Amino acid sequence: MAERSELHTRNKHNGQYDFSLLTENYPPLRKFVLLNPLGIQTIDFFNPHAVKALNKALLISYYGIRYWDIPRNYLCPPIPGRADYVHYIADLIDPERVSNTANEENGDKPKRQCRCLDIGVGANCIYPIIGHVEYGWMFVGSDIDPVSIENARKIVTCNPVLAHKIDLRLQKDNRRIFDGIIAPDEYFDVTICNPPFHSSKKEAEEGTLRKLSSLKGEKVKKTKLNFGGNANELWCEGGELRFLLNMISESRKYRKNCGWFTSLVSKEKNLDKLYAKLKAVHVSEYKIIRMCQGTKNSRILAWRFLE
C-alpha cells in the first residue's frame, strides 16, 4: 500500500513514501515503519496510530504544518487522495480571474485570491491546509459538528502559515448545506465536499467490513467505526445520494454566489439520478472528473450556473 499510481501530476505524493525524510522530520513515525514482503518500507495501514503518525509526518514534511491532531474516533484521511481532489479542482479555476500558483508558473498575472468553501471540513481540516499551502487559496470550512469546528480552529490557530486564511463556521441546521453558511453578498470561486457515504450506522459498519475484508484478503467479522470516522462523517439519512440531491437543489439559490460547485461521488450508481437533478435545476454546465489512486477509482462531480 506504500505505492500509488496515476495521481495528479502536481501531487507531491506520487510514487513511494520517502520514509527517510518522513521519520527525520517526525521521529515518532519510526516505530511504525516495517518492511513488506517485497522489502519495501511501509506501515500497517490497519493501525490507526500508524496512519495518524504518517499523516503528521506528511503534513510537516510537505506542507510545513507543525501542529496537527484529531480527537479520538474522528476521521483520519489519506492525504494523497485528499491532495488529488484539490489539484483537480485547481484545474477548474480560471487563471484570468483568480490567484492560482499552478497557473502563475505559466506567467499568468492573477487578479485576486481564490476563495473556496469546504462543506464538511471535519476535525482534520485537510482540504483547507492543502489548498492554502499549495495554491494560496482562502477558505471557509463548515461543519455540523461543534467538536470538528473547534478542533479545526485549533489547527489553524497553532500554525502561523494558516492564520487568518481559514474561517470555520458551524452549520446549525443539519438539514441545510449552503443555507446559514453563505452570506448574501459573499462569493466563492469553488465549493468542495466529501459527503457521508452511507445511509445508516449499520450500512457504514457493513461497508467498512467489506473494505477491510477486501484489503486483507480474508473475512473480517468485527470492526469499529472509530477506525474510519465519527458517525456524522460516515453516514446521514438517505446517504450520499440524498445529500447530493439536496446540495444540487440548494446550489440553484446560490448560483450567483459560487463559480463552481463540486463534490466527490463515491457510488457511481448514483450518477444518473444526479445528472437528472442537475438538468432539473437548469445548470449551465456539468462534468465528471475521474481520479485514480492506486486500485481505488473515484470521481468529482462539478457543475455551474452561467447567468
Swiss-Prot record:
An example Gene Ontology cellular component term from the record? cytoplasm
Q: What is its EC number?
A: 2.1.1.181
CDD domains annotated for this entry?
Answer: AdoMet_MTases
So what does this thing catalyse? adenosine(1618) in 23S rRNA + S-adenosyl-L-methionine = N(6)-methyladenosine(1618) in 23S rRNA + S-adenosyl-L-homocysteine + H(+)
Localization of this protein: Cytoplasm
Name the keywords, alphabetized. Answer: Cytoplasm, Methyltransferase, rRNA processing, S-adenosyl-L-methionine, Transferase
Entries under Gene3D superfamilies matching the protein:
Vaccinia Virus protein VP39 (3.40.50.150)
Q: Which GO terms describe its molecular function?
A: 23S rRNA (adenine(1618)-N(6))-methyltransferase activity
Which BP terms does GO give this entry?
rRNA base methylation
Reported function: Specifically methylates the adenine in position 1618 of 23S rRNA.
Family label: Belongs to the methyltransferase superfamily. METTL16/RlmF family.
What protein does this entry describe?
Ribosomal RNA large subunit methyltransferase F
What organism is listed for this UniProt entry? Bacteroides thetaiotaomicron (strain ATCC 29148 / DSM 2079 / JCM 5827 / CCUG 10774 / NCTC 10582 / VPI-5482 / E50)
